[in-house]
Structures are given as structure tokens and as C-alpha cells.
Amino acid sequence: MQFVEFAEICNTIEGTSSRLATADILAEKFPLLTEEELPVFVRFMRGRLFPDWSSEKLGFGPNLLYDALAYVIGKKRSYVVSAINNAGDIGKVVESLIEKREQTMFFSEELDLLDVNARFLQMAKSSGRRSQQERLRSAQYLLSNATPLEGRYLARLMLEEMRIGVGEGVVKDAVSKAFGVPSDIVEHAHQALNDLGEVAFLAKTDPSRLSNVHITAFRPVKMMLAQQGSITSMVETHGTLAAENKYDGSRFQFHKSGGKCAIYSRRLEEMTASLPDVVKMLDKATDHDVIIDGEVIAIMNGKPMPFQTILRRIRRKHDVGDAQEAITLLPWVFDILAADGETLIDLPFRERRKILESVMNAYVAPQLVSDSAEEIEAYYHSSLDNGNEGIMLKVLDSPYLPGNRGKLWIKIKPEVDTIDLVVTAAEWGEGKRAKMFGSFLLACQDENGDLLEISRVATGIDDSMLSTLYDLFKDKIIAEKGKTVTFEPDVVFEVGYAELQKSTNYEAGYALRFPRFVRLRDDKDVSEIETLESLTRRYSLQNKEE
């Protein structure tokens, strides 16, 4: 497939508001692609350059894109930055500038989908002193040979921000329709493989294999998530439940196979080098090959420390030994996804728990199994007294559903008025904060993963955190116009609020009353932020409409 055809399909989809129509467009194209092209096409459509389980990064930000584009159009970098600041949509700006470029190429090569992918892989593997220069040259090559429309989507791919309305659900529907595979089999394969490109490849080449895929060591899968709820309603609905402490820690997934160990964050980024002590503890605690779900907490004088304490360890790239002495970590494990090569996610939670206890000789999280709301309530208050956030309630017959935030796991906390949102923009501050970002624009996501603005937040951010946030965001700036700065949307805030209100001022149709910054959620991926569906559910519960 020529890349221009890919760009034309993207353009068609971008102008399509119907989810079903988008799935139909993809389902029509999937069978026409070669076995090598299909997984690349699927990933690119979602703005992904690598499988979801991979922690590989392109290492290419907005600043390098500005430099590459300036070279291609024969203008100064400041001209490019000004154009982007005035327009905002970086893809469409690149399209426009390539269309108007003065430095016309006497010859150009047609871009092929697989050649573009090979360039991206080469950029990701660049290392050493000249790595940025090598990435820049690759970007210059791609943009120099691009048509204006190709340039729009190349730029978005380089920043891994496609945003054309192709979410996981749309791709799964398209795979099912294109190759006649039942949707539940596609869903199960995606849960185990965590790569829709590979799911599509198997559906095309050997659909029977989709029913027999397994979770594989060192290919992390998404973690099962929880909704908010109440003890009473859970007991009334399910009867006997498992209650566990809800730790104020950092979620992890531990993999051990053939004597090798690795640990991954909630965002599926490997953090083995940052947490060697935790890896060693878990390695010693089992003689089995395992994939385990858990949470690591910081401890001082026998009591849990705040989440931000752990972040200081996880962020540490150097002098990890000194950090180990300063901050003591303790892992708790509470679920098991695979043991000795066998995938366990389809087993009921009660059976997975028994297997977990049989393969681990330490660090298994304490648990209460009860059908008494009063007993669970007492367990909840005891957990709070011990410095935890609250408790988790889990349905004993539930499978492990990677990436699913359903009603099988429920979190019980004193405050239910916090929400995870992604930062999309900021306003420069005033007075002594003039060189810092003063307020931040926040967004939730719709069913396709497209971002919808819902609130601004400035309250609750002290000077120290403002400095931290400036350092975090300064290299993520995409555009700047007046006092408004637009960012790559990949930083998540946990935000408190007094009330959720309906509003026409924001794209989501809701607004937060008295929003306040609670904490930075480095451990969370943008895919985990609040959805429009869950906001609607929150609003209904708040107003007792359910």
C-alpha cells in the first residue's frame, strides 16, 4: 500500500462521524492488505507505532518536528512555530506548509506504508550522541517526499496523536466483520495479546489461532480496573465478596520466566532498573514462572507513605542504590494472570486467588471473604486506620478482564469526588508565577478515545508543584497563542471537585464545580482517563437518577 492511500483513508474517516461507518470502511480495507501491511495499518490508524505491550518510543517530540519541517519548506524555524501557534492543529499546518513550500523538489520518492514503518523503527532504535540528528534526518526524508495530505498524517504519527476517531472498539468490530470472527473471540485475543495489529494478522492468516492465544511473559497486558460503588449495593447484588486493602501505591505487573524477571508499570513501561529491590523480593517469593498483578507501596515506621513518595523511586534513573536506602518499598500481590505457561484470566477470581497463594510464599495481599455488609464496613474502616485509601470489593466468580473498568471490581474510598483527566493546554500565570503555567485545561475521552474538554484547574497547586509541572510540560508544547499553550496530551491529573454539573461551556457537556488539583498520576496512561460514559453515570448517581 502506498502511504498516500493510507492518508486518503484517514482523511475519509476523519470526516466520518459514524462509528459504524468507520468500522465498515476499515472492514472493507483489511482483507485487501498484505499480511505484512495489515498490522502496521491497524497500529497507524490508532496513532500507534508499536504494539500496545511495547515500551518502545519514537523519541521524537514537537521541537524536532518543527526543525524537520523548517528544513523541508525552506523557512526559518520561527516561521513554522508561528504558523502552528496560529492554527493549533499541527497536522493540518504541516499539510498547508508543504502545499506552499517554495523549495520544490526536482525529484521525490513515493512513500510506501512499510517503508514509512521501517523509518519509524529506525528512528526508535537510534541511540548515542547523534541519535537526535539521525531522527531529524529521517523525519526530513519522510516530509520531503510527502504530498500535503501525507504530511498531515505523518506529522500526527510522529507525535503518536492521530485522533481521527479510530478507537479499540472500532478496530475490533472491523476485524470481526472483515474476517468473520465472532466478536467475543476477537475481544479475548486482544486481552491476551495486547496488540490489535497482531489480532488482525491472526484473523486474516489463521482465525482458529485466535481462540488459543496465551498471555506471554515480558509482553505486559493491560490491568483490570475498578469502578466506584458502595458496599451495600455490592453485597445485595453478589452476596459473598472478596474485600482487600486499596493501597495508595503504584500498580505493577511482575513477569518471571526461565530465571528472568521484569516489572512493568500501570502504563506498561518497564521499571525493572528503577525497582531492583522489589524485583528481587518477588523473585525470591516464588519458584514458578508467573505473571502477577500487584501494587508497591512506600513504608516508613510500619505505615504506608503517600503515593508521591513512590514516584520519586520510580522516576529515579541514577543512584538507585541511594534511593533504596532512603525509601523502603513493599510489594503486595493480589491476582495472577499466568502460571507455568498456563493463562489463567478466564478462571474465576476465587480459583486464581488459590493459585496465587500456592505459588507465592510471601507478599500476598490480605483478604476478607464475607457476605456481611457490616463485616466489610468494619474491614473498610480498619483499612483506613492502617493508612490505606480504602478497600477493593471483588466478585468471586469474575474473570480477569485486562483493560476493563467494569462492575466486577469496585473501589470504596472516603472521597468519591476525584477524577482522572488528561491535560491538553495551560494558561501562563501572572505576577510571580508569570514564568509558570497558572491553570490547566483538562479533558475526558469518548468511546473512541477522542478527547473532550471538561474543566480548568488552578487550585491546589503549590509553587513546588508548579515548578515540577513546568519542567514536565515545557518539552510537550505543541503550540502557543497569546497566553494559551497547547500540549501533547499524555499527562494525567487526579482532580477533586464538589459537584458535576451539566454545561455547554465544555465539549464534554459537563463541568466540574470547584475543581482542585489532587496529584499528578505519572503511573496512568491517557487511555485510563475518565470516559464520557462514566461521567454520565457519575452525574446520574450524584443526582439520584438511578
Swiss-Prot record:
Tell me the Gene3D superfamilies matching this sequence.
DNA ligase, ATP-dependent, N-terminal domain (1.10.3260.10), DNA ligase/mRNA capping enzyme (3.30.470.30), Nucleic acid-binding proteins (2.40.50.140)
Please identify the protein, giving its name as recorded. DNA ligase
Q: Which GO terms describe its molecular function?
A: ATP binding; DNA binding; DNA ligase (ATP) activity; metal ion binding
Write down the species.
Answer: Methanocorpusculum labreanum (strain ATCC 43576 / DSM 4855 / Z)
Asked if Thylakoid is a keyword of the record, the answer is: no
- What keywords is this UniProt entry annotated with? ATP-binding, Cell cycle, Cell division, DNA damage, DNA recombination, DNA repair, DNA replication, Ligase, Magnesium, Metal-binding, Nucleotide-binding
CDD domains found in the cross-reference section: Adenylation_DNA_ligase_Arch_LigB, OBF_DNA_ligase_Arch_LigB
What cofactor requirement does the entry state? Answer: Mg(2+)
Q: Sorted alphabetically, which PROSITE patterns does this protein's record hold?
A: DNA_LIGASE_A3
- One matching Pfam family is DNA_ligase_A_M
Q: What positions does the entry give for ATP binding?
A: E244, R251, R266, E295, F334, R405, K411
What is this enzyme's class at the first EC digit?
ligase
| Annotated GO biological process | cell division; DNA biosynthetic process; DNA recombination; DNA repair; lagging strand elongation
Instruction: Write down the PANTHER family for this protein, in alphabetical order.
Output: DNA LIGASE (PTHR45674:SF7), DNA LIGASE 1/3 FAMILY MEMBER (PTHR45674)
